[in-house]
């Protein structure tokens, strides 16, 4: 099939999964073109069936800001005409599903172009934050309902979309996935020595995110403070975002500034996750929780909030630990238990790795997208 994939290029679950999906589909013989504002973060090595097309939104003085939606629709029309897309797969409802909808209307109006089917994948904040905002909610609901097919990355997100936006679309759940050959235990001993300052007794606690408010990075610092009262540890922050600075300031205010290491955005996350002893994810909500799945694949235990899609792959006390978002004391207690009980630690990381390998590897999930593409194309021809 000829497939266009629209996504964000930044470090975040939706863009990472969209790019990994594009790479996997190309490897399986499909012609895939990625469309985004810039080269996606996880865009890998060259493949003859995979290409990238940037969207450029020029600035004109009469307009208050760049019109990315219109530029995106225009680019999708151009690339679809060139490659005769069977499907345009939009990851994240706004603005990508809206851009795909406009492109489909333009192609259909010409009377001579192939009109692709539009599939929208919902990832989380496109529904829970953007979609819930009255300024966007009707547009988001319209774009979802106008899609030929809709998927969500978790059962929780599907239920929340129906409840909050009252959409009529049939939403298929297809979860996120990982290349399980790539995501495995592969620690970097030199990195560990640097981060622990050559102290073999020091544990490394890590948080990976885009540092938006929903990720609650200040809560990460507070949980770390409580764990550190019982276990010698340092906190490693991976990623960039609006709340990173305030989280670091919070650590300094608590006298923990010297115990925090900021690594910024990192393309090669496997050795970092494998080097850590514990991952904290106290989010207010998670459409899926890809960073938790990545940690489990790398045999690093996760303590997280019992929200969104996380309970759909983390079983509390078995493959990880889940607590209400505001119960930071319980999260800290679970962290201390893992870091001081070797049997519990090994049992948890093995169970986590087993869950990933059984249910969330590329070969288990990508064929479900292929089947869904065929179903939508054949059903609506």
Task: Report each predicted region and the residues it spans.
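Conserved donor-binding/catalytic core segment of Leloir-type glycosyltransferases
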Residues: 151, 198-224
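A short helix/loop element that forms part of the nucleotide-sugar donor recognition site in Leloir-type
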Residues: 184-198
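Aromatic "clamp/platform" in nucleotide-sugar-dependent glycosyltransferases that forms part
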Residues: 265, 284
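Short hydrophobic beta-strand element within catalytic cores of glycosyltransferases
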Residues: 301-304, 314
